[in-house]
UniProtKB/Swiss-Prot annotation:
Gene expressing this chain: ycjF
Basic and acidic residues bias spans: 1-19
Segments passing through the bilayer: 70-90, 100-120, 213-233
Region (Disordered), start-end ranges: 1-35
Family: Belongs to the UPF0283 family.
Subcellular location: Cell inner membrane
Pfam families for this protein: DUF697
Name of the protein described by the UniProt record: UPF0283 membrane protein YcjF
Membrane topology of the entry: Multi-pass membrane protein
GO cellular component: plasma membrane
Tagged with keyword Lipoprotein: no
Keywords: Cell inner membrane, Cell membrane, Membrane, Transmembrane, Transmembrane helix
Main localization category: membrane
Length: 353
């Protein structure tokens, strides 16, 4: 039994033909041109690093959940109860002339005061680290602003935080370059081009030194446990040095927080770049055949230390990156390879002598 015919369907618009892509004209390369041909490199790092920046900003500004507020309220109530009970014990000991109990209350008050002071100090340092993110946002707004009146005060505050004296030659050149007719964008831009590179150069030197030490230590040390302890210690020292250069005093919790943010940023944006830099060396210069396995591991550890220093520099820096002033792993890669080759050649030539 045949199926009945389906009713006709009328369309409101005619069917649109799919556009066909036009092919480009054929190009024929000569033998000489084929040797010098190089494919265009596609760099996807800005998009990846934008995602990483969003993740870091989200971690730097955590949301205040209800449970966290309840815990903080409970701790505050408990602290007030402890203080009230201590005051009551002190009054009772004074009235009953119980000098032993009064001495115990005084000792407890000193301990509590020291604990509260350390907590306040740690909170202030952690708050200072969070304020650096707000300063970067403010600097980014000023770099796109055409208003007048905020740029100079903002830059003077940054110079004071970094410990740059008013009589410093770089700051004097900045003062000589600015005038009243310039807007905030131009003033902050001059500060970023004249004053900020001085601190960035010091941070680059620290990163190069610590990365070279990590590379050489891994290359010559036969103990993996010693290598791990040394790398962890030097990486923490590097973070402290960079934070000090940019005028941030790190406490215990702020140091842990910065280290966690740096590792988070590396996990998001650094893995692909690290693999690309190491792979570039292995493929182009055949390092696997020229260097030993320990030397290759040393280069990897040095690049990881350099990457950590770059991200710590980015999080501690009060200004956003402008144009191409951000340091790249390639800047440190060639230096690490040269230093490692020179060290290995010296170690091979010394026994022959």
């Amino acid at each position: 039994m045949s199926e009945p015919l389906k009713p006709r369907i009328d369309f409101a618009e005619p069917l649109k033909e799919e556009p066909t892509s036009a092919f480009k004209a054929q190009q024929t390369f000569s033998e000489a041109e084929s040797r010098t041909f190089a494919p265009a490199a596609i760099d996807e790092r800005p998009e990846d690093e934008g995602v990483a920046e969003a993740a870091v900003d989200a971690a730097l500004r955590p949301k205040r959940s209800l449970w966290r507020k309840m815990v903080m309220g409970g701790l505050a109530l408990f602290g007030a109860s402890v203080v009230g009970q201590g005051v009551q014990w002190t009054m009772n000991a004074w009235q009953t002339q119980d000098w032993v109990a009064l001495g115990g209350c005084a000792a407890g008050a000193l301990i509590v005061g020291a604990g509260v002071g350390s907590v306040v100090t740690e909170w202030r340092r952690l708050w200072r680290l969070r304020q650096r993110a707000h300063e970067r946002d403010e600097a980014r707004e000023l770099l796109h602003s055409h208003s007048v009146g905020k740029g100079r005060a903002f830059c003077e505050k940054l110079a004071q935080q970094a410990g740059i004296d008013q009589s410093h030659p770089v700051l004097q050149r900045w003062y000589a370059a600015i005038h009243e007719t310039q807007n905030d964008r131009e003033i902050v831009g001059l500060y970023a081009n004249l004053v900020q590179p001085v601190l960035d150069a010091q941070a680059r030197r620290e990163i190069s030194r610590f990365a070279a030490e990590s590379t050489l230590m891994i290359a010559v040390s036969p103990l993996a446990l010693v290598d791990m302890a040394f790398i962890a210690w030097r990486n923490l020292r590097l973070i402290n040095r960079i934070a000090t250069l940019y005028g941030i005093e790190l406490g215990y919790y702020s140091r842990l927080r910065l280290f966690r943010l740096v590792l988070l940023n590396i996990a998001f944006a650094g893995a692909s770049e690290l693999v690309r830099e190491v792979g570039m060396d292995w493929m182009s210069q055949d390092l696997a055949a020229r260097l030993s396995t320990r030397a290759a591991q040393g280069i990897g550890a040095g690049l990881l230390t350099a990457r950590l220093g770059i991200k710590a520099m980015e999080l501690c820096r009060p200004l956003p990156w402008i144009d191409n002033d951000k340091p790249r792993l390639g800047d440190f890669r060639r230096q690490l390879i040269g230093q490692l080759k020179e060290t290995l050649q010296k170690s091979k030539s010394s026994p022959e002598k």
